[in-house]
Amino acid sequence: MAQDPVFITRAIEAAPFPPAPNVVISYPHREDWWNRYPAVRKSYSGNRSYDEFEWPYQDSKRIYQDRVLKRLRHLQHSATGRAVLAELRARPSYSVCIFPWDFLPSIDRDDPGDLGVTETLRIPQTRRERARGIKPRGTKYLERGVSYASQYKPGAVDVFYSDYRCKESEADGVLLHELVHAMRMISGVFRYSLMGGGYGNNEEFYANMIEMIYQSERRLHVFDYVGHPIDQASVLRLPKARELITDLCRRQMSLCNALAQVKADFNPIRSVAEKLFRIDL
């Protein structure tokens, strides 16, 4: 039986994001790029110089890196984005590699409506886990738990994202959503539990909630995982919402504290944190 293609097979081109150097804007090797776009390769075939072959690849790489860098800078200039980037930066042994959506292994293209996908790391994180060969907490809850593009670099979480798939008003938030997944993976707290309200599971609830805090901070509309309008009260009425936010705050206190202080009309974390820690935010 034919295998679904994996599009990244060689060493990648990497551009670290300076405020969080382990967040890496990543681009495939030129040979993988040409192989991914055979029609483009065919149009450049024939008696052409190396420079003529190199130009379209370098131009495409530059455009992608510039666009992702713009999104990351937007996040860095927001309190919500800085909170998530700080959690990622605090674990420098683990990388988050952001790749173009087109290079997502086709085995993962289950839902054409997906705007971004995050794959988990596979290696032990703590000294105890390394000594005993224990997989990271949360890995066993993932259906496939494989880091396709970063098999050459253990400890990397891969995010597949291209902003052309998103509305302009939502493009930053979609990237932040995927970075929340990556942050929880490398923090060792990623795990699935059922969640109602259209979210499916707790991890999508967390990622959507933090994405919407960011949207609200920017005074943009907020919506649930399936696109329905929401407000803070409606989210806190959901079964398990307060329980999950409390768990987030207890397991990731620095993240919770930073997010609770974000000045936004929609911020369910603030409401829970005020009661949990008995503080006035």
Indicate where each model-derived feature is located.
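A metal-dependent hydrolase signature that marks the N-terminal structural subdomain at the beginning
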Residues: M1-G133
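Active-site or metal-binding loop neighborhoods of secreted/extracellular toxin and effector enzymes
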Residues: A2-Y44, F190-L281
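Ordered hydrophobic segments in well-structured contexts
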Residues: V24-S26, S95-C97, D158-F160, G173, ...
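Soluble non-cytosolic domains of exported or imported proteins
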Residues: D59-R62, D66, L75, R165-E170, ...
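Short amphipathic alpha-helical segments that mediate assembly, nucleic-acid/protein binding
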Residues: Q65-V68, T80-L85, D114, D172, ...
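Stable alpha-helical elements in mature extracytoplasmic
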Residues: V68-R71, A171-D172, L179, E203-Y206
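Sec-exported extracytoplasmic/periplasmic mature domains
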Residues: H77-T80, V180-G188, M212-R219
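Active-site scaffold of zinc-dependent metalloenzymes
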Residues: D102-D172, A182-I186
